[in-house]
Structures are given as structure tokens and as C-alpha cells.
């Protein structure tokens, strides 16, 4: 971050003249970009580049990696919307896209693409439009799947810009329109190559409207004449073109090559995999390579690489040949005479038939009539030396020709263009080292036609040197190594390869000859006939009559002699002006294709007889004769075909260069670099701006052409790998053949050894036969012995079967005996079990008899005690009244306590309701536990309500029981005797009630704490424990209004010694005293208790029931022992307060019972 603090200083150091400082600062910026993820540094670099146009900053921006790609695209999207920075940012986008970054697939989803399309739809600046169209054309092969979203936008842009080329808005300079037309032509090629069905459908729908018909006729239709019928138009569909699966297997250079394959333009089409042009085409133009450096136009064409050319209208083409425009250029070029054969062309039947695409001829041309294009020019097919259609090469040199046909050889060799570092060396073209660039350039400046002029050849070389200065030496070494490898792999012979239709057909010559004728005319015009062309014409005239059947003959007689008339010169000047801008199809050079190794010219009609049917050949011959007659009748009338926009642009640059050099040669200025206009003064501002814009457009066009050249070079490297693999496979096949021969020798040796083995086998066979006869005799003897042994074994087998049957019978008898023994053992065990059961029953009967005798004695003792007493009823009634009063008070207090408990229960209900509300609030946050918590809360509420209802029912039962007891005591007349006992019992009950109240509160508090500790689960103590804390409870529930009093539980030291005082003093006729145990889970009170504490689990209730049952059995046994020991004791007095034994006043019968019996009585 400390380095980013002084970004301004670092940016200023980027433009330092010291390479070390520049490299260090660049490294710092790259490291900062790798560590910094924010957009600040990228935005600063973009702003600085827009201000200074710094090349180091451009290098950093074009090598950005993820995630800074999003920041760069967003920043460029922001500046595209501003008119002031739109051109600069489009140039930056072009630089970034041409390097094909790793994140190029994100361009289809970035907002920059819609902004670019909107700019191309809305902007009116031609420079911006041309730059944007070239950037879009470069991007389309990288993001072909974007056509599914923006296809209509691409078509709208094409329709808008194509109409501009015709309507010519008033504020647009004519020179700009030439560049725009060339870029629109390139866009046409790209859209037609990638989306032919949709594009043709758009053209059909868009240009069927009346207002667009003129645009179609003048602009679009000439473009369509230079493309083939796309195969997708036959086999594909609109949806298939937009299917992303179509582009998955294609890389960027594959898409570019596929688009180039459908072009008929020789500078745009791709020649590979059999796309060869007949050597006759190269023989027709023997001076193309010789004159390649004498014209500024030719090198511009080479710098463009695969610059395509489309037809244009005649009116627009003739604009440049009118005397009012560029007169000096035309006059300077027209004053130089040209040989007649270089102005001629071929007649094309497509122009007459109205066909936009000439039909391709079948690829069945014999091998002796055509040669591979690459090998015909001395290059290797598929090797590093690229075909002429690729941008990586300049026009190839001419094939070997006779000495008189190579008149321009010495001059052309002296001024040959040195190959640039992008060019690929081949075996037939000498490789000039880089040190020869300066002398060659100086030699060019000495030529008459280029004296004092700045040729356009130096511009792409200079730009290429700036762009790739660092890796130039490595590329030179790589090219030399590849050239050496190619020379080792491939042979020098030109193997015959069947050419593909289209390039070998006669119609292809029409599209190719225009640019080549232009090249010859411009080259010869620039040289100014420095070499006498008469040997060439004499040779052409000499070879002319040798042709037996000429389908196309020249219209004008050969010219170029020194004694030509002035009228003839004027005619040649006029024809030259026409041929420069609009090459004529009605003229053809008299020379024909020269086959390699011979001077004979093969007849042209032989190609038609092979490539086309007889009817087509007859048709072409007939048309040729008609044209010849028409040309002889009116030789001045020439058919003017369309010229491609790229050719117009090239000729404009050529003529501008010629006019510039001519005007500078006329001016007598001391320094031509200072004052360079026609008038010798400073140029006007608008002219400077126009020239700068034109230079920028040319630079953008060169960058686009360099991109295409790089894609072709990448393709060529892939083809080189294929050639290497093919050579390796050939070597592998040769090795396999050698192995096959060795294996054949081995087979012969194995055959000889096989014969030897067969002879040996026959000997062994004879030996085997003798051995077999001996063995047969031994076998017969052994068979006889075997039969004897077999008879003996049969006898033994019968004896064995008899023994087995006897054993089976014995086993059956043994099983029967075992079954009888088992049955006897079972009966014995049953008898012994019955005996043990009878003994236990007998012991129980003896125990019960003893207990019956003891109980009878106890009963007699109690009867004697009752008979010996003399009760005083008056005193007893008073005491009973007092006791009942106290008991009434106690019941009232008990009722008060019950009310308090009811209030507590209500408060508990309120607490539970509040707890339920809290639970409901909690349930909103915990959706997973909604049902469980809701059921628990509702269960708690129901338990509290059921407890309350049960408590009320118990209270009512107790009141009824009290009233019933009062009624019984009054009937029996024992109220007076029981008053004293009641008073004492009331006091004891009050004490116990106090203790019970304290214990209840403690137990209730403990229960609440336990319930709160288990997340709302209510846990109750055992029913027995509840009774122990709450004191004794009187329970009654019989249908016959009979009541039973239960003994309350006490702490363990007093649990079995308590008594109920009022009942102990009853007479013998009263209800027997009941000593009760805790209720079980199936008794009446047990069910009530379970209703009070419903939230307790069933398993706990069952366990409690089992514990209470065992406890009741223990209580019965202990009380039985106590009753047995009471016979020898004197009963205590009534006033004795100790509750450990029954009172002496109690005369009733002692009854041991359980709550289970009460439950059965109620049921």
C-alpha cells in the first residue's frame, strides 16, 4: 500500500526513457494488481492512458487478469457513454480484445457489449463508427454465442452503416466513407460467415422494402458477388446457427478461417486442405512478385494481409477517375504507358446470368492440369509458409519463366521488399536478414516513381517493430528453425492435388485478376518503364498464335512499341484510368498458364472440358465469340464490374502517395518536412485533423489486418503440427513395412521348420500306432479281470443291502422304545409337580387355620371387653358434640385451606397461561418444535383444570362423608361418650393440620421448581408422598352410603402407630375399623390421583402402583402381628394421647383391607 500512495510518481516514471526504471515500475504495478482487488488502481491507469496515451500503461491494461477484468470493463463502459473519450476507449478496447485475454468469454455478458452496440447504432462520427465496427468484428469470433442475444443489433448496425455508404451524409468526408465502406464489407463477411441463415433472412426482409432497394443494389449486392453459397444455407437452420454447441469445438482462429473460406476474394479467402489454385493463374501474372516493392499500393495490400475486396457501384468508382478529383494523381499515372495484356480480364458468366455467387466447379481436374497452390509457388502445403490468402504473407513470387518473360527481373530483385518478422519463410524464396532493411529502403527511395515519397510499406513495419520489439529475435530464430524443419520434411516435387471447386474454376480468375491487374498497372506506372517491356510483348505475341483454341482473346491489339501514335497513347491513358479503378472483364492477356518445366502453354478449353459439362463449355465459347465481335465493333465500350471497397481504399492511398511525391518534387522548398502542402505554407487545421483521423483509421485497419494475420499464423502453426504428424506417421508406416518384411522372413523360416516338424510327427505317429496295438491287447486282458471283479462286487453288494435293511428295522424299534421312555418321564414330572402343589396347599391350609384360631380368640377377647364396660351415654354425647364441633371447625379450616389451594391452583393456572403465552412466542422462533411444545402446554393446562375439578369433587365427598358420620353417631347414641375423644382428636388434628400445611407448601414449592427445571413438564410426587405431606384424608364413595375411614400416613417412625380416635371407641355394632394402604394405580383414588397429575408418565404411575401394592402387603402383615400380640395387653384409657396402639375404648372388629377392595366395592 505504501507503493500505491505515490501513484502519480510511478505513472510518470512509466514513461521514463530508461528501460530498467520502466520495467521496475511495470513490475510494481503488476504486483500491486495481483495483491489489490479493488478497482482504484485500474481506474487510475485507464484515466492516465486516456490523458497521455502511454504505451507502458497500455501494455499493463492489456495484460490484466481476473478479477480486474470486471473493473476494466466497467470503466470502459463508463467512458463509452461519453463522446469525448469514446474514440480513445474504443481503441483501448481493440488493443485488449486483439490480445485475446483469458477472460474474453466474459465479454458477451459484460455491459460493455450493449454499450458498444448502442454507440454503433446512435453515433454519427465516422472515425468512431469505423473503429467500433472493427472492434466488433474482432470480438465476434471470440464470443460467437453472443449472437443469440444481440444478433438483431448486429444486423441493425450493418443496415445502418451500409446505408451511410450510399447516402453520404453532408458532414462526412469522402475519404472517411472509403474506410467505413471497407469496415462494413468486413462486417458483411463476418456476419455471413458466422450466421448465414439469419443474415440472409435479414437481408431478404430488410432490403425488400422500397426505401432500401437502392442500398441493396449499390452496396450489398456487390458484396454478395464475392462470397460463395454458405453450406449452412443448405444444411443448417436459424436455430442451429445460434446453438452454443456449434461453437464449443471451434476456437477463435477456427471461426476466422471458416469465415474466410466462403470468400471468393483472393485477398480474403483461405487456401488450405486442397483449396489450391491452378498454376496457370500464377503464370498469367509473371511480374507480380517482381514489381511488389516498386508500388506503395502493393505493400499496403500486403500490410493489410487478408484485406478483402467487395464490389462497389460504378458511379462511386468513377468518382476517383473524374478530372475534378485527384487530377494530378491520375495524370501522373496515366502518362506512363502499360502493356496491353496487363489490362485484360476474363469474362464471367455470373455477371450476365445475374448470379451473386459463381458456381463452384467439381474437384475432378486431372493432376497434370493443376498443381497445389502452395507448391506451385514454391511453398509447402500446410507448412509454416502460409498461402497467399493468409495475412501472414506477401504475394508469392512468380513461377519459373523463360528468359524473355523475366525482363523486369533485375530491377525487381534489386528493390525486393525484405520480409517482415511476421512473414513465414519458405524454401523457394530467399530469406533476407533484418540488417538489409535499411539498404533496401534507401534503394527504394532512389527509384523514379518513389523519389521523395513516404511509402506505406514502412508504416506497418514501423508499427510492427514497436509492438513486438522485444520478441523479434526469438521469432526470427523460430522462423528459421521451422523453415529448416519444413525443408527436411517436405519434398521439392509438386505433388498433384485435386483442387477444390471455386478457386480452380474459370470464374475465380475474374475475382482474382482485378487486384492483380491493379498491381501490375500500379507497379509499372511507378517504375516509369525503367526497363524496356518490348521483350515481354514479343514473347507474348510469340506465344499467342500457338494456342489452338482460345476461348478468350484480347480485344485490343498488343501495344507498347516506341512509335505508337498520340491517339493510341490517349486511348491507353483512358483505358489505364479505367483499369486502375474499374478493371474491365472484356480484356484478357494473350499469354496462358505456363506449366512448370516446359514452355508450352496448355489450352484453356481443356480445363473447361474437365471442370464443366460440354453444355457449359459450349455456352462459354459462344459468349466469348459474342464478346469478341462486340469488342471489335465498339472497342471503346467496356463492361465495368464492381470493385471491392478495400480495393478502392488501397487505390486511394496509392494515388495519395503518388500525388504527394509529385507535388514535393515540383516544389522548390528548402525543407520538405516543414512545408509540405501544395502552396508551400502551413496546413490548415481542418486538413490536419482530417489527415490525423485518416491516419487513425488506417492504423485501426492495419491493427485489424494484423489480428487476422495472427489468426492465420496460429492456424498455420496448427497445420504445421499436422504436417509433422503426417511425416511421423509416414515414417511409422515405413518402419511398419520393414517390420512386415522381417515378419515375412520369419514366416518362411517357420514354414521350413514346420515341414521338419511334420516329418518328425509322421515318425512319432508310426511309433504311436505300434504302442496302441500293444496297449489294446493289455486293455482286453484287464477288461476280462474287471468283469470277474465286478461279479464278486455284485455278490458283496447284495449282502450289504441285507445288512442295511436289518439295521433299519433295529433303528425303528429303538425309536419306539425312546418315545415310550420320554412319555414315562413326562408323566413322572407331572405327578411330582402335583405332589409339590398339594404339599404347598396343605401348608397354606394349616397357616390359615392357625390364623383363624388366633382371630377367633381375639374376637372373643374383644367381645368380653365390650360386655364388661358400662357406657355413660350422656357424657359420651357431650363429648361427641364437642368433638364434632371441633371437627366442624377443623373441616371449615380445611375448607379454607382447600379454597386457598383453589386460589393457588388458579394462580398456577394463570402462571401456566402466561407460560403458555411465552411458549407461543417462543414457538414463532422455533418452528421445528411447534407441535411438541404446544401439546405440553395444553397438557399442563388440562392437568391444572382436572386437578381443580378433582379437588372440588373430593371436597364435596368429604362433606357428604362428614354429614353421614354425624347421622350415624346420632342414631347409635354415642355422641356423649365421644366428645372428650373428639376434643383430643381435634387438638391432634389441628396439630397435624399445621404440620400438613407446612409440608404441603414445601412440597408444592418443590414441585414447581421441579416442573420449571424440565422445560414446562409437570412432575408430581408419588400419591403416597402427597398424602403423607398433606395429612389424612377421609374418603368415601360407596353407592350404599357406607363409608370407610383410611388411616393417614405419617413419617416412618409413626406410620403404623397412628389411630383415628373417634372410631376406636365405638361399640361392637359399629363399622369395623379399617387400616388402609396406599391406593394402587387401578383403584378409585388411584385413578383420581392420576387425573390430578396427568402429565406424569404411565410408566412412573405403574411403578408407583407396584410399590404401593408391596407396601400394603407389608402393612397387612405388620398389623396382623400387632393384633396377635394385643390379647395379653390391657387396653389403654381413652385419654391416652399416644397413638402407637389401638385405644382400649375401641371395641370394633379389626379389619385389614386395601384400596383395591374399595375400588372393587365401588365398581
Curated annotation (Swiss-Prot):
Tissue occurrence: Highly expressed in brain, spleen and kidney, followed by liver and heart.
Low complexity bias: start-end ranges: 321-337, 1029-1046, 1131-1146
Chain's role: Non-catalytic component of the TSC-TBC complex, a multiprotein complex that acts as a negative regulator of the canonical mTORC1 complex, an evolutionarily conserved central nutrient sensor that stimulates anabolic reactions and macromolecule biosynthesis to promote cellular biomass generation and growth. The TSC-TBC complex acts as a GTPase-activating protein (GAP) for the small GTPase RHEB, a direct activator of the protein kinase activity of mTORC1.
PANTHER family: HAMARTIN
Organism: Rattus norvegicus
Residues joined by cross-link Glycyl lysine isopeptide (Lys-Gly) (interchain with G-Cter in ubiquitin): 30
GO MF terms, alphabetically ordered: ATPase inhibitor activity; Hsp70 protein binding; Hsp90 protein binding; protein folding chaperone; protein-folding chaperone binding
UniProt name for this protein: Hamartin
Transmembrane parts of this sequence: none
Biased composition (Pro residues): 393-402
Keyword presence, Coiled coil: yes
Feature: compositional bias, Basic and acidic residues: 474-487, 1008-1020, 1088-1099, 1154-1163
Subunit structure: Component of the TSC-TBC complex (also named Rhebulator complex), composed of 2 molecules of TSC1, 2 molecules of TSC2 and 1 molecule of TBC1D7. Probably forms a complex composed of chaperones HSP90 and HSP70, co-chaperones STIP1/HOP, CDC37, PPP5C, PTGES3/p23, TSC1 and client protein TSC2. Forms a complex composed of chaperones HSP90 and HSP70, co-chaperones CDC37, PPP5C, TSC1 and client protein TSC2, CDK4, AKT, RAF1 and NR3C1; this complex does not contain co-chaperones STIP1/HOP and PTGES3/p23.
Membrane topology type: Peripheral membrane protein
Stretches for region Disordered: 295-337, 353-594, 1008-1163
Coiled-coil regions listed in the entry: 721-919, 970-994
Amino acid at each position: 500500500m505504501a507503493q500505491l500512495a505515490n501513484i502519480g510518481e510511478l505513472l510518470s516514471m512509466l514513461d521514463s526513457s530508461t528501460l530498467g526504471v520502466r520495467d521496475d515500475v511495470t513490475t510494481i504495478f503488476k504486483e500491486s494488481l495481483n495483491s489489490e482487488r479493488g478497482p482504484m488502481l485500474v481506474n487510475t491507469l485507464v484515466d492516465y492512458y486516456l490523458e497521455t496515451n502511454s504505451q507502458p500503461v497500455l501494455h499493463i491494461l492489456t495484460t490484466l487478469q481476473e478479477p480486474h477484468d470486471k473493473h476494466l470493463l466497467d470503466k470502459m463502459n463508463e467512458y463509452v457513454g461519453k463522446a469525448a473519450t469514446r474514440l480513445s476507449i474504443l481503441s483501448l478496447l481493440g488493443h485488449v480484445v486483439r490480445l485475446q485475454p483469458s477472460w474474453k468469454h466474459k465479454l458477451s455478458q459484460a455491459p460493455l457489449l450493449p454499450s458498444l452496440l448502442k454507440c454503433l447504432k446512435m453515433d454519427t462520427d465516422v472515425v468512431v463508427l469505423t473503429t467500433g465496427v472493427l472492434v466488433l468484428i474482432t470480438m465476434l469470433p471470440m464470443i460467437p454465442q453472443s449472437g443469440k442475444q444481440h444478433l438483431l443489433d448486429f444486423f441493425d448496425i450493418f443496415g445502418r452503416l451500409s446505408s451511410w455508404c450510399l447516402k453520404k451524409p453532408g458532414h462526412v468526408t469522402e475519404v472517411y466513407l472509403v474506410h467505413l465502406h471497407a469496415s462494413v464489407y468486413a462486417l458483411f463477411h463476418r456476419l455471413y460467415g458466422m450466421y448465414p441463415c439469419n443474415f440472409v433472412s435479414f437481408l431478404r426482409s430488410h432490403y425488400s422494402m422500397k426505401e432500401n432497394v437502392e442500398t441493396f443494389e449499390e452496396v450489398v449486392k456487390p458484396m454478395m458477388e464475392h462470397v460463395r453459397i454458405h453450406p449452412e444455407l443448405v444444411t443448417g437452420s436459424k436455430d442451429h446457427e445460434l446453438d452454443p454447441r456449434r461453437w464449443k469445438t471451434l476456437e477463435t482462429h477456427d471461426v476466422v478461417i471458416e469465415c474466410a473460406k466462403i470468400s471468393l476474394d483472393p485477398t480474403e479467402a483461405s487456401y488450405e486442405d486442397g483449396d489450391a489454385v491452378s498454376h496457370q493463374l500464377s503464370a498469367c501474372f509473371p511480374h507480380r512478385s517482381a514489381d511488389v516493392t516498386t508500388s506503395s499500393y502493393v505493400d499496403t495490400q500486403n500490410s493489410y494481409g487478408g484485406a478483402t475486396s467487395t464490389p462497389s457501384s460504378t458511379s462511386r468508382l468513377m468518382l476517383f477517375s473524374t478530372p475534378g478529383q485527384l487530377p494530378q494523381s491520375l495524370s501522373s499515372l496515366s502518362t506512363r504507358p502499360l502493356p496491353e495484356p496487363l489490362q485484360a480480364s476474363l469474362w464471367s458468366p455470373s455477371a450476365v446470368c445475374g448470379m451473386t455467387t459463381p458456381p463452384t466447379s467439381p474437384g475432378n481436374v486431372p493432376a497434370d492440369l493443376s498443381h497445389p497452390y502452395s507448391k506451385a509457388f514454391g511453398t509447402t502445403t500446410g507448412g509454416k509458409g502460409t498461402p497467399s490468402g493468409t495475412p501472414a504473407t506477401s504475394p508469392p513470387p512468380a513461377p519459373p519463366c523463360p528468359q524473355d518473360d523475366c525482363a523486369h527481373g533485375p530491377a525487381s530483385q534489386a528493390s525486393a521488399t525484405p520480409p517482415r518478422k511476421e512473414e513465414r519463410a519458405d524454401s523457394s524464396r530467399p530469406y533476407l536478414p533484418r540488417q538489409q532493411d535499411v539498404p533496401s529502403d534507401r534503394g527504394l527511395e532512389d527509384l523514379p516513381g518513389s523519389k521523395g515519397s513516404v511509402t506505406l510499406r514502412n508504416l506497418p513495419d514501423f508499427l510492427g517493430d514497436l509492438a513486438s520489439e522485444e520478441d523479434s529475435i526469438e521469432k526470427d530464430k523460430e522462423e528459421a528453425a521451422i523453415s529448416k524443419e519444413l525443408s527436411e520434411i517436405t519434398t521439392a516435387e509438386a505433388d498433384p492435388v485435386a483442387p477444390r471447386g471455386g478457386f480452380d474454376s474459370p470464374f475465380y480468375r475474374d475475382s482474382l485478376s482485378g487486384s492483380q491487374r491493379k498491381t501490375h498497372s500500379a507497379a509499372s506506372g511507378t517504375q516509369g518503364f525503367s526497363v524496356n517491356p518490348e521483350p515481354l510483348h514479343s514473347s507474348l505475341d510469340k506465344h499467342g498464335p500457338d494456342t489452338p483454341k482460345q476461348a478468350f482473346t484480347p480485344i485490343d491489339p498488343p501495344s507498347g512499341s516506341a512509335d505508337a501514335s498520340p491517339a493510341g497513347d490517349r486511348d491507353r491513358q483512358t483505358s489505364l484510368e479505367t483499369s486502375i479503378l474499374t478493371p474491365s472483364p472484356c480484356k484478357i492477356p494473350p499469354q496462358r498458364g505456363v506449366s512448370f518445366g516446359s514452355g508450352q502453354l496448355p489450352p484453356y478449353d481443356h480445363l473447361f472440358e474437365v471442370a464443366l459439362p460440354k453444355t457449359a463449355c459450349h455456352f462459354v465459347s459462344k459468349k466469348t465469340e459474342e464478346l469478341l465481335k462486340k469488342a471489335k465493333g465498339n472497342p471503346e465500350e467496356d463492361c465495368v464490374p464492381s470493385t471491392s471497397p478495400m480495393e478502392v481504399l488501397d487505390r486511394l492511398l496509392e494515388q495519395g502517395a503518388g500525388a504527394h511525391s509529385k507535388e514535393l518534387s515540383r516544389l522548390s522548398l528548402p525543407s520538405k518536412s516543414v512545408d509540405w502542402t501544395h502552396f508551400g505554407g502551413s496546413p490548415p487545421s481542418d486538413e490536419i485533423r482530417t489527415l490525423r483521423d485518416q491516419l487513425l483509421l488506417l492504423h485501426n485497419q492495419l491493427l485489424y489486418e494484423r489480428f487476422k494475420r495472427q489468426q492465420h499464423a496460429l492456424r498455420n502453426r496448427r497445420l504445421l503440427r499436422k504436417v509433422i504428424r503426417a511425416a511421423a506417421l509416414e515414417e511409422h508406416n515405413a518402419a511398419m513395412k520393414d517390420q512386415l518384411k522381417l515378419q515375412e522372413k520369419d514366416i518362411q523360416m517357420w514354414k521350413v521348420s514346420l515341414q521338419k516338424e511334420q516329418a518328425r510327427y509322421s515318425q512319432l505317429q508310426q511309433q504311436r500306432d505300434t504302442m496302441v496295438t500293444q496297449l489294446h491287447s493289455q486293455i482286453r486282458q484287464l477288461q476280462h479281470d474287471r468283469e470277474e471283479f465286478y461279479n464278486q462286487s455284485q455278490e458283496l453288494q447284495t449282502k450289504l443291502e441285507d445288512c442295511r435293511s436289518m439295521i433299519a428295522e433295529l433303528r425303528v424299534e429303538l425309536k419306539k422304545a425312546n418315545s415310550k421312555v420320554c412319555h414315562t418321564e413326562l408323566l413322572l414330572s407331572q405327578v411330582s409337580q402335583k405332589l409339590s402343589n398339594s404339599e404347598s396347599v396343605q401348608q397354606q391350609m394349616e397357616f390359615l387355620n392357625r390364623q383363624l384360631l388366633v382371630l377367633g380368640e381375639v374376637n372373643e377377647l374383644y367381645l368380653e371387653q365390650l360386655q364388661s364396660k358400662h357406657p355413660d351415654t350422656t357424657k359420651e354425647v357431650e363429648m361427641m358434640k364437642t368433638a364434632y364441633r371441633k371437627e366442624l371447625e377443623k373441616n371449615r379450616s380445611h375448607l379454607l385451606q382447600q379454597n386457598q389451594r383453589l386460589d393457588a391452583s388458579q394462580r398456577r393456572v394463570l402462571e401456566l397461561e402466561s407460560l403458555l403465552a411465552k411458549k407461543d412466542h417462543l414457538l414463532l422462533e422455533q418452528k421445528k418444535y411447534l407441535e411438541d411444545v404446544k401439546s405440553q402446554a395444553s397438557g399442563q393446562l388440562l392437568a391444572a383444570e382436572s386437578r381443580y375439578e378433582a379437588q372440588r369433587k373430593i371436597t364435596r365427598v368429604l362433606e357428604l362423608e362428614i354429614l353421614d358420620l354425624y347421622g350415624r353417631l346420632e342414631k347409635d347414641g354415642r355422641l356423649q361418650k365421644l366428645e372428650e375423644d373428639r376434643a383430643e382428636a381435634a387438638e391432634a388434628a389441628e396439630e397435624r393440620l399445621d404440620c400438613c400445611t407446612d409440608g404441603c407448601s414445601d412440597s408444592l414449592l418443590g414441585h414447581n421448581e421441579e416442573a420449571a427445571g424440565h422445560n414446562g413438564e409437570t412432575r408430581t410426587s408419588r400419591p403416597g408422598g402427597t398424602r403423607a405431606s398433606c395429612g389424612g384424608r377421609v374418603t368415601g364413595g360407596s353407592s350404599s352410603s357406607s363409608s370407610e375411614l383410611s388411616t393417614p400416613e405419617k413419617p416412618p417412625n409413626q406410620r403404623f402407630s397412628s389411630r383415628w380416635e373417634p372410631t376406636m371407641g365405638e361399640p361392637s355394632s359399629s363399622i369395623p375399623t379399617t387400616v388402609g394402604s396406599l391406593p394402587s394405580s387401578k383403584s378409585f383414588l388411584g385413578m383420581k390421583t392420576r387425573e390430578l397429575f396427568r402429565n406424569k408418565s404411565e410408566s412412573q404411575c405403574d411403578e408407583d402402583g407396584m410399590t404401593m401394592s408391596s407396601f400394603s402387603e407389608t402393612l397387612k402383615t405388620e398389623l396382623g402381628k400387632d393384633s396377635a400380640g394385643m390379647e395379653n395387653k390391657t387396653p389403654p384409657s381413652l385419654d391416652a394421647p399416644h397413638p402407637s396402639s389401638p385405644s382400649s375404648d375401641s371395641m370394633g372388629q379389626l379389619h385389614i383391607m386395601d384400596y383395591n377392595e374399595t375400588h372393587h366395592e365401588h365398581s
